[in-house]
Amino acid sequence: MTRPRYSARPRIQLDGRPMRVEPGSSVAAALAARSPGNSRVSVSGEKRAAFCGMGVCHECRVLIDGRLRLACQTRCQEGMRVDTVLEHSTPPGVAPRHDAAANACDLLIIGAGPAGMSAALAAAPSGRAIVLVDDNAAPGGQIWRDGPGASIPAPARRLREQLTQYSNITLLCDTRVVGMAGLPGQRALMLENAREGWAQHYGALILCTGARELLLPFPGWTLPGVTGAGGLQALVKAGVPLRGKRLVIAGTGPLLLAAAHAAHRAGARVVRIAEQADWRALLRFAYRLHRWPAKAAQAVALFNPHYRTASHVLEATGDGRVQQVRLRRADGEETIACHRLACGFGLVPNIKLGQMLGCELDAHGGLHVDDVQQTTVPGIFAAGECTGIGGNERARVQGTRAGHAAVGELTQAARLSNDLARWQEFADALRGPFALRAPLLSLARPDTLICRCEDVPQSALAAHQDWTDAKLHTRCGMGACQGRICGAAAQALYGWQPLPPRHLLAPARIDTLAAIASSSGNSLD
């Protein structure tokens, strides 16, 4: 698979006005290039814009050609009509019906990042029918996300090319899982793309659902211009213009430096990188990096003179969008003027689909797997960041092992144990130095919104004892993102454990539900 070539600048209609956009850029990039750059208005009247940058938070939802889509996940195309006024209704009509028999495969792989691509390539020589699904426009996952501002590394290019060499691998990009199709145990998932929805039946399943950012609330975090650190990276790759803009990046973990590097390459002025960990913890971590020379070299290459330890965000302020950031330092406070603020407080595994299917978790909150990557549910395997945060090298080894095991090649899977142990040691080394310190868990004020979808403030949650109680009384976690942002935040802040989803993983269109009901012989009437 060759990387798409971006040539002519497509013309789109944005809120009824014609606009030329950069080739290959996302709709979120087009929104950011205009003034104002917000994509929607919240339930309490606040302006909002792209936040997570990777299809998790749903803040950037807009109407595209009459259908509700996520701006950060959709590439601009010639003649596309984008509308930020969400009161419009979806045009009538039911999606084309799929033949259930034609949508059956031997092996279904969810997620086409490093783990998913490696799993597909390991399983492909067996001749089994493989379907590889990803909600991005091209394979690569978040780490190798494509776009006009992306630089795709050689390992990603090789994996993409190898995928095209197997006729038994069907790649479905721009496609997401919205839930289970049928009853539990029927081995079918509900898939949906921009045009239609269908039930995808499978024999074995490999979950390579990756991870998402932990995004903690603080005063001003809902202002347009505030994003996640990984969200900033994703938006840069999608073509969001940053040249000459002043950026502050805050939070914890190696992702801060990676985001700063991406922003600098895009022409931004990164004026501060605030890492909450202290220098002693980072020094201990750096001392261990000699065991992984490539990681040590990467750390040196990403060094930035504006990096500060024992520093964290306190508040973002501005008129209609972020204009200033107040930071806590070891020796006091500082206020910095900026155009954008990117905050990331680490990564959390994407486990919801596995939980919905009955898979149990391990002690660190990832999907529990055995020595061949099988979860606690027979026939369901997992690989990559959904089993714990550990980097793309670990993900590729796990994916390869899962691919072999899923088609019965257990001897080949067992041979990878030593390789995996080396990268698992690196994953274990990541946990301690970047553990969140207590001050970051008390940044929110009573009026700070915890649930961005339903505009639920911290004060509304204070009287509740657990996640279910809070949902019932405040609608926290019941908006478009289905608790992916506020659920993880509430778990960090209050120790609440969100319950696994029951049947639906994400909001689904009526035509998708109708098509699946029809294919199963049921009716929505």
Task: Label each PLM-derived region with a short phrase.
Residues 227-236, 340-390:
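FAD-site-proximal beta/loop scaffold in flavoenzymes
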Residues 105-162, 244, 249-250, 254-290, ...:
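Beta1-alpha1 glycine-rich phosphate/pyrophosphate-binding loop at the start
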Residues 26-28, 32, 40-76, 447-461, ...:
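Local cysteine-cluster metal-coordination motifs and their immediate loop/turn environment
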Residues 45, 66-107, 145, 156, ...:
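FAD-binding core/adjacent interface of flavoenzyme oxidoreductases
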Residues 37-51, 55, 63-94, 138, ...:
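Non-heme iron-sulfur electron-transfer modules
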Residues 383-418:
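A conserved FAD-binding loop/helix module that cradles the flavin
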Residues 160-193, 200, 264-352, 363:
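A Rossmann-like FAD-binding core segment of flavoenzymes
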Residues 308-364, 426-494:
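C-terminal catalytic lobe of FAD-dependent flavoproteins
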